[in-house]
Amino acid sequence: MGVQGLKTYIESSSRNDLKTWAFRDKQLIIDGCNLFYSLCFDSNLDQIHGGDYDTFEKVVRQFFENLSACDVHPYVVIDGGDDHTDKKWDTLLTRKQKKIKDAYDLSVGKRRQVLPLLTEKVFKQVLKKLKVPVVQTLEEADWEIAALAEEWNCPVLSNDSDFYIFNLRAGLLPITHFHWRKVRVNRKTNQKFILSKHFIARKFCKSFKMNVSLLPVFASILGNDYVKLPNIKNRHWERYSNPGSENPQIEGLLNWLSQFSGPDEAISALLRPTSNKTKAQEELSHGIQDYKLVPGSLAQIFRSTKVPQKISKGPLHVLPRWTLRPILDGKMSSYIINVLLHNRASLNAQVEDFQLPSANETSLHIRQVFYGLLLLGEQQTAGKRESVKGTTKRYVVEYSRQQIKRSSENVEAIQTKAMEGLRLETLYQEPHAVRLQVILDTLGVSCEMLKGTPDALQLQMFVTRYWLVNAEPQPCRVHLWGLLLGMVYGKLSSSPNAQKDMLSRLRVKASRKGGSVDIDVAHAYSQWQSCLKYSLNLNYLLSFPLTEPDCASLYRGSLVHQAVGELRRGISLEALLVKGSSAERIFKQLKDIIVSLMGDDFIKKMKSGLEHRDAGKTQRASKGQKDELDIYFEQMMIESIDSEDEELLDVRKSKAKNHLMELPVCPIRARHKAKARNARHPCKKYERRCFE
């Protein structure tokens, strides 16, 4: 939701609608999706390399720790599926195209904002660790957030301009003006607080001598995500504005509305010159109703484990009863709501090679199994059973991309042998072994492979195996080693006994200013992240037959891209690991697992990736420009070269030979072959060490 231009108008220098508030010791209803977008985009975090999730986790932790220091009690509410009426669908499609274009622009070095794929999952995991109360609604959360805030008489934290329209007694705290990074202390009381700005709709309307009940009419006329009335919106409202107004259309409309005592009188005046009065009145009435607050369901959901009966009535009855609590708790992805309710799914574009099919193509088989569990089999709850004429097949419309254009395609839901006889209504009651076999078959993993992999590493390693087998173009060895080095970093950085010196040397400040990226590396890792995301969704639906990994420790984009760059510059893998270190031990464990899953011959036959060592340079700004990561490593070597032991520079060569294992390949839609990028440019090889 959102009223275009309203937030800017209220924050303009000529207005005085935001009042300073030393915020502390209150309940706070937080717009969760708005918050994680803000924390990601306002913290200068990596986006071009696919995200630095460990750094994002630290930002989220700091935010809630600062709230706690000020005795603020947060309640986080996250959006669920699309509205069952589909009244916002056109807006969502428009945003989909914009997000694709933003991802493309970022991939070619322009400054854009693209949310890394696993951001929401990491956000939810951090909230769980911190025991922050959180609810994921079944549909859009804005109305539920406002209703709860009014019921509990506490403010809302959000940047969504729709909360300027809701008549909330306790008002709105815009995230933009919520200075949480610097906790202040009241010298008189010695109490900590967060300096913020506070908006009250009643006081805003008072400045125009306008009835606050007219604000929903105002929002409906200007148009939000739900209501579009171009003939009424474009009536030259600026003629009612004051001279020198920073936004004459908004101010003029507010001045015009102030002459009416209430919504009915204003609507009558609006409709007089309108030809299609019935349709316009219907649109206005629906728009006004969207802002009418009555007690919702969130209070009961936050305070009780019991699911309110009313939340799954009507179209939402397609959701099996057992899925409701996991969805509300944020444990199960709201992705299933759109599949069951609308028979569609929207796939996020990432920083990838836009000349190739979407990186999400690699995870297609995983999604098809997911759709099969939701849509196939005997389901008493099945509401919309649309199928192609003459067949019993079920399809989901996937919205993705073809190059930089939004596209849609019917994707068949499939049923594997392990899924025979399974019903969605009773899926959670199936034995663990049955649910486990479904995800193992999907990822192409045998029982022998399962036994040889520690529980805590199973999901991430099986996803990596699936990626290596199914990704096109096939990942190179440097992609694999870079990914594993990132996991080593994540493991060590999350350990309380981590080698601090090693960690400080590996930290790289991500650059958002035209930062270079090797597009083949970005595409490969976007494919891996897509496989991980949809494997996590499948694992949730199957009630966690595999241990859920800590996503923040699995991928640090700036580091893995940096590692690939070092390998392509001639640094041997052994030289990146210090002999006898924890890093070497963990890397060897991960490498041994992958070799056992893939077979030694498969690894040896993979392309090295060194033939692309200069590929990224010709796709970015200038050939002579040195990457910030390269400069970082040069500085690191100057600092450490004098104190290094000669023994640590010895390159160790592994002579282990493993048998080739048969690799089941999952069916994937046909893709275009990647074009050759650049000829190989040999460069001088030299050795450096990253892990100490």
Curated annotation (Swiss-Prot):
Its EC number is 3.1.-.-. The keyword Hydrolase applies. GO terms for molecular function: 3' overhang single-stranded DNA endodeoxyribonuclease activity; single-stranded DNA endodeoxyribonuclease activity. Coiled coil: none annotated. Keywords: Hydrolase. It comes from the Eukaryota. Structure-specific DNA endonuclease that specifically cleaves single-stranded DNA and 3' overhang DNA. Belongs to the asteroid family. This is Single-strand DNA endonuclease ASTE1. It comes from Danio rerio (Zebrafish).
